[in-house]
C-alpha cells in the first residue's frame, strides 16, 4: 500500500516524507472541556472522507466508521487484536476458512441496521471502485483477483448466511488476514446508505454515514471539519462529544499551544531544538505523551542502477552512514537504531538480527576497492520537494557520510507527483523514507517491498533474487505462527545483511504535549498523527 507523509502520518504506511499533521487546538472563546468539545487543526485538508479513495486521509474513517476488529496497545508496548463489529470468529485448521458472527443490534448513525451483507458489499466495493486505494487489504480473499480484474461480478470468497453470520474463504492461507481487518482501510459501509448516496458518499457529510462514535456535521473544503457524538453508537460513550477541526499551519499551532489555546500539540512537526527547550525541558515536561512509533526509517537502494548492482557497494553504503549522529542531531535522540526491516514492537521483531550494523568507514573503503570503485563514484539520492526539514537534514548528513568514503551523492529534488512517478516506475536511484505499520504483522512491510517482482519495481529496489521473492510470498501462507516468524527473521537477514538492498536507519518516538484540559490521551497504537477522538479524556 502506498504510504504517506502527506496529510497525516498514518498507516502503514510509506511516508516519502512530506510535512503534515494533526494537532488538537482549543481556540479562544470555544466551549470548555466540561462541555465535551475540543478543537483540532490539520496542516492540509483531507481529499476524501471515503476510506476506499485515499491512503492518506483517515481522520474520518477512524472516527465515523468501524472495522470488524481493532488494535489495542498494552502498557508493555505489545499490541493485540480485539473485536469491534465482529463478535466472534473461527478459523479452519488449514487457515483458509474464516467464519464470523457480527455483534447484534449495531446500527449506522441514521438507524440502518448493520448486516453481514454490508461486509460483502464493502469488500466488493474495495475491489471494483475505480482507483481504489485499498485493494491490498482484501486481495487474499478467494476470487478477489478475478473481481479486481473484471473477470467476475461478485466476490465468491464471501458467503452470507444470514444478517449476523458470514464466511470468508481465502485463496491461500494468510495469517495476517485478521490484522488487515483491524485497519481503517477495511471499515464497513452500508450497502443501502452508499447505494442511495451515490457520488455524495464521502463528499457530503450527511450522506457519509457509519457505525462509529462520531458523525460528520460539516466539511468546508480547505477550511474546516466538524464532528458530533453519534448517539446511536454501540460502544462506550466517549468523553469528547464535539470536535471542530481547522486547517492551520504548524507554526500557528505551536504559537496557539503556547497561548493556552491548544489541547494537544503534535511535536512531530516542530524542530527538535524547540521540542527539547520548550517542551521536554520546559514547563510542559510533565505533560508529554510519548509512544514508540511502529515504523522504520530506511534508505533504499536501486539494484538496477550501476554501481548499486554490486552487493559490495551496497554493503559499503550501509557501513558508511553515521546513523546515531542523525538520530541525535536531527531527532534529539528521540528514538533507537534499527538493524533490520521490522521496527521495534512489530510482531516478528528479531533481536537476533539486531546489533550487527556498526559504522566502519575503513571497511567501507575496502569493499569499494574490491568492487573496483577505489576512487568512488557518483549517485543520486532522490527527495520529495515537500519533504519535512528532518528528512532533508537526514539526507544531507547521509551525503556527507558517503563523501567520506569517496561516494559523491547528489541530492535531487522532485515535486511530489514526479517523485512518486519515478519511484513507482522502478527508476529512482535511492531515497530515504518512513514506513509506519498499517497492521501489526511483518507481512505489512516485507511483502509490500519484496513480495513480488512488481512490488520490487514499484518501490524502486528492483531486488533480483526471485527465489527470495518467492519465499516472501510463501511466508504469508505459513499457518504455524512460530514457523512463520522464524521465516520472516531469516528473510530479514537475507535481504538486509546478505544482500544489502535495504539500509536500516532508526525508529522514532512520537511525542505529544497535553494541554491543561486533557486528562488522558491515548495516541494511535502505531504512532500515527491521526487520532481517535474517543482516545481523548477531558477533565
Locate predicted features:
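N-terminal lobe/hinge region of extracytoplasmic solute-binding protein
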Residues: 41-93, 209-210
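Short, low-complexity disordered leader/linker segments with a strong preference
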Residues: 1-38, 49, 358, 537-539
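Detector for C-terminal structural segments
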Residues: 220, 318-348, 390-397, 422-539
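Gly/Pro-rich hinge or "lid" segments in bacterial periplasmic/extracellular proteins
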Residues: 73-76, 153, 163, 170-238, ...
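Alpha-helical secondary-structure segments
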Residues: 115-122, 163-169, 212-213, 240-242, ...
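Structural transition elements
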Residues: 336-370, 385-393
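Aromatic- and charge-enriched surface segment that lines or borders ligand/interaction sites
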Residues: 87-135, 167, 256, 307-309
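Ligand-site clamp/hinge motif
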Residues: 230-276, 408
Amino acid at each position: 500500500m502506498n504510504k504517506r507523509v502527506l496529510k497525516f502520518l498514518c498507516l502503514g504506511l510509506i511516508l516519502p516524507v512530506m510535512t503534515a499533521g494533526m494537532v488538537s487546538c482549543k481556540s479562544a472563546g470555544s466551549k470548555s472541556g466540561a462541555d465535551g468539545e475540543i478543537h483540532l487543526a490539520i496542516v492540509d485538508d483531507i481529499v476524501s472522507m471515503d476510506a476506499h479513495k485515499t491512503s492518506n486521509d483517515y481522520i474520518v474513517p477512524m472516527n465515523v466508521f468501524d472495522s470488524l476488529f481493532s488494535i489495542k496497545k498494552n502498557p508493555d508496548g505489545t499490541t493485540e487484536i480485539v473485536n469491534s463489529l465482529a463478535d466472534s470468529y473461527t478459523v479452519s485448521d488449514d487457515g483458509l476458512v474464516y467464519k464470523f458472527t457480527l455483534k447484534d443490534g449495531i446500527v449506522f448513525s441514521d438507524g440502518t441496521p448493520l448486516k453481514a451483507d454490508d461486509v460483502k458489499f464493502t469488500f466488493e466495493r474495495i475491489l471494483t471502485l475505480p482507483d481504489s486505494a485499498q485493494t491490498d487489504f482484501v486481495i487474499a480473499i478467494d476470487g478477489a483477483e478475478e473481481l479486481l480484474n473484471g473477470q467476475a461480478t461478485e466476490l465468491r470468497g464471501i458467503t452470507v448466511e444470514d444478517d449476523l453470520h458470514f464466511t470468508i474463504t481465502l485463496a491461500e492461507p494468510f495469517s495476517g488476514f485478521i490484522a488487515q481487518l483491524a485497519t481503517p482501510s477495511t471499515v464497513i459501509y452500508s450497502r443501502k446508505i452508499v447505494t442511495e448516496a451515490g457520488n455524495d458518499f464521502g463528499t457530503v457529510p450527511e450522506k457519509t454515514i457509519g457505525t462509529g462514535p462520531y458523525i460528520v456535521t460539516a466539511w468546508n473544503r480547505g477550511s474546516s471539519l466538524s464532528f458530533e457524538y453519534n448517539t446511536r453508537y454501540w460502544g462506550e460513550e466517549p468523553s469528547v462529544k464535539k470536535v471542530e477541526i481547522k486547517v492551520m499551519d504548524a507554526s500557528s499551532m505551536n504559537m496557539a499551544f503556547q497561548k493556552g489555546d491548544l489541547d494537544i500539540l503534535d511535536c512531530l512537526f516542530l524542530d527538535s531544538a524547540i521540542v527539547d527547550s520548550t517542551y521536554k525541558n520546559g514547563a510542559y515536561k510533565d505533560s508529554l505523551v510519548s509512544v514508540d512509533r511502529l515504523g522504520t526509517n530506511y534508505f533504499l537502494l536501486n539494484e538496477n542502477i550501476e554501481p548499486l548492482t554490486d552487493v559490495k557497494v551496497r554493503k559499503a553504503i550501509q557501513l558508511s552512514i553515521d546513523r546515531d549522529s542523525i538520530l541525535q542531531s536531527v531527532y534529539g535522540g528521540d528514538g533507537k537504531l534499527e538493524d533490520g526491516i521490522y521496527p521495534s514492537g512489530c510482531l516478528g521483531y528479531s533481536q537476533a538480527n539486531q546489533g550487527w550494523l556498526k559504522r566502519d568507514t575503513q571497511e567501507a573503503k575496502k569493499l569499494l576497492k574490491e568492487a573496483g570503485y577505489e576512487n568512488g563514484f557518483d549517485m543520486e539520492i532522490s527527495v520529495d520537494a515537500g519533504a519535512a526539514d528532518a528528512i532533508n537534514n537526514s539526507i544531507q548528513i547521509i551525503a556527507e557520510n558517503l563523501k567520506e568514503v569517496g561516494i559523491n551523492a547528489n541530492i535531487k529534488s522532485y515535486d511530489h507527483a514526479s517523485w512518486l512517478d519515478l519511484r513507482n516506475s522502478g527508476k529512482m536511484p535511492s531515497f530515504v523514507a518512513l514506513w509506519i505499520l498499517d497492521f501489526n504483522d511483518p507481512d505489512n512491510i516485507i511483502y509490500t517491498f519484496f513480495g513480488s517482482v512488481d512490488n520490487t519495481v514499484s518501490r524502486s529496489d528492483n531486488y533480483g533474487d526471485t527465489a527470495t521473492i518467492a519465499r516472501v510470498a510463501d511466508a504469508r501462507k505459513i499457518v504455524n505462527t512460530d514457523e512463520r516468524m522464524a521465516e520472516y527473521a531469516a528473510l530479514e537477514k537475507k535481504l538486509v545483511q546478505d544482500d544489502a538492498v535495504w539500509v536500516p536507519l532508526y525508529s522514532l518516538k512520537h511525542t505529544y504535549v497535553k494541554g491543561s484540559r486533557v486528562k488522558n490521551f491515548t495516541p494511535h497504537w502505531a504512532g500515527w498523527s491521526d487520532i481517535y477522538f474517543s482516545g481523548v479524556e477531558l477533565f
